[in-house]
Amino acid sequence: MPMKVLDMFCGMSAFRTAAELIGGFSFIGHCDNDPTAIAAYRTLYQTEGEYFCNDARAVNTDEIPDFDLLVGGFPCVAFSAAGARRAFDDPRGTLFFELSRILEAKHPAY
């Protein structure tokens, strides 16, 4: 049975592409706020019927199907030398807390 995966901050599908190459994974949903990235993601993969949200802060955990694994490459520019290093003063710097909120609500196996 494939491991069910929720792909947060999915961008253009790096995690999904790797998982597809490895095999044994089934994606139940994805989330990203970049329309261009989502368009590319949906061009590469059949996502009809998957859970989708374009804002991690708006994810309603009651609407997400159960999953085994959450993956997510949350934005790091708030902490990076490539950014202004505003850390938690930058709204992007708090997005990883959304992963924690989802994990606490859903209790996936991994």
Residue ranges and their predicted role:
Residues 1-110:
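Conserved active-site and SAM-binding loop architecture
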